[in-house]
Each structure stands twice: as C-alpha cells, then as structure tokens.
C-alpha cells in the first residue's frame, strides 16, 4: 500500500473523527506508521502487519481518544502516562496530536522502550519520552494515566496509582463495556464516565473508561 493511499485513508479518518490536525502532524503520523513497519521486521512490536490494518487499528483507534482527552484537559498543558505502551499506542499519537501534553510511554520490554525513544528523536517530539521501567516504580505525578489493552481495570489502577496526581484521572481504552472489571475496582476508585468510541472503518466495539479516586 502506497504512502499516498495511506495518506488518503488517514485524511478520511481524521475528518470522520472531527479532528483539526496540521499537515505537519499528519505527516508525523504517517512517518510514525512507517517506523512501526520498519522496526516490526526485526522486533515484534505489533501482531498487525498489514499497513491498512495498522492505519485503522493503531492510528485511527488512538486518534479516537484525542477529542475526549482534549475535552478533559481543556487544551491546557498537562502530563500523561501511557502504561504498557508497546509500539507507542496511544501515547505517540497523543503526543503528535496534542503538543501541549507531555507524554511518557512506559514499557518493561527494553526494545519497545528503545523504539519509543527513536520515535521521539526521529519525529522531533520534545513532549514525548520512552521509558524502560515498571509503572509501579514511577512517581509522577501525571494528570492522566492511560492504557490500551494493558490489563484489567483493577490491576491498571493498582499498579499505576502511585504515579497519579492528586486530582488526576485514569483513561482506559477498552473493547466492549467492561462491566465485570468495573465491579472489581477497589473501593477507593470510582468509574465516573464511560463513552463509546467510533473508530472509522473499525467494526468492533470500543469504549473509553474514565476513573478517579473517590473524594
């Protein structure tokens, strides 16, 4: 699939999501996709190999959280931690789309953290860092902590709670509404909002689960 075809698909997806991204940001997203493809030949960053599927399942899926995230932050400078980031999803996409947000992507696998560091350098993203560490060891504080297919909600908040700012929130990307997982959240954590995400060209269910410490 040519870059031009991927660019057309990205443009259509961005329009469907109602996002306003510059030509430079769109170019960075395509460059990022190419970096994933290049590194994936040597390192197993993602099981998805087809460029069109990468566009939909990785870029557009991650872009779907940008509008809800901006609504929460109000466009103000803030900090975000992406836990179990892997190839940088959604962290790298957020760093590109939201330059006002300082994004740290943490992964326990050294080669994935090295890839994230390479992405930050190659795409010249001063607001992006790749960290090789365990989330339990990070102090933060982060205004938003996110994850995409990382762990159960209970484990996610337990492992990352030490890095959350006093008035911070967790933003978990999930498939269908995780009723069973919500029921096992610790008593000191409340789910205060769940919203359905509409990912262009993706037929499965996607939702965003927002959580915070009880006041």
Residue ranges and their predicted role:
Residues 101, 176-215:
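Active-site capping/gating segments
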Residues 36, 94, 173-174, 211:
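Residue-level signal for inorganic ion chemistry
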Residues 135, 150, 199:
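Hydrophobic pocket-lining residues within nucleotide cofactor-binding pockets
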Residues 102, 127-129, 169, 190-193:
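Conserved beta-strand segments of alpha/beta enzyme cores
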Residues 167-177:
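Conserved beta-strand signature within the Rossmann-like core of class I S-adenosyl-L-methionine
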Residues 1-75, 111-114, 118-126:
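Class I SAM-dependent transferase core
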Residues 60-147, 157-158:
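Conserved SAM/SAH cofactor-binding pocket of Class I
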Residues 157-169:
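A short glycine-rich, Lys/Arg-flanked "PGG" loop and its adjoining helix->strand segment in the class I
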């Amino acid at each position: 699939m040519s870059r031009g075809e991927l660019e057309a698909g990205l443009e259509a997806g961005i329009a469907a999501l109602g996002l306003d991204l510059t030509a430079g940001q769109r170019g960075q997203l395509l460059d990022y996709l190419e970096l994933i493809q290049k590194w994936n030949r040597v390192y197993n960053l993602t099981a998805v190999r087809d460029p069109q599927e990468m566009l939909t399942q990785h870029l557009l899926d991650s872009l779907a959280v940008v509008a809800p995230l901006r609504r929460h932050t109000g466009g103000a400078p803030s900090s975000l931690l992406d836990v179990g980031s892997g190839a940088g999803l959604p962290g790298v996409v957020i760093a590109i789309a939201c330059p006002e947000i300082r994004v740290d992507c943490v992964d326990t696998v050294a080669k994935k953290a090295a890839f994230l560091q390479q992405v930050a350098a190659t795409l010249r993203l001063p607001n992006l860092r790749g960290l090789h560490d365990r989330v339990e060891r990070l102090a933060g504080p982060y205004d938003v902590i996110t994850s995409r297919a990382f762990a159960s909600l209970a484990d996610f908040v337990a492992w990352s709670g030490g890095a959350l700012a006093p008035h911070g929130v967790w933003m978990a990307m999930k498939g269908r509404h995780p009723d069973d997982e919500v029921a096992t959240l610790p008593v000191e954590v409340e789910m205060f909002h769940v919203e359905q995400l509409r990912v262009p060209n993706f037929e499965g269910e996607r939702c965003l689960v927002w959580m915070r410490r009880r006041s």
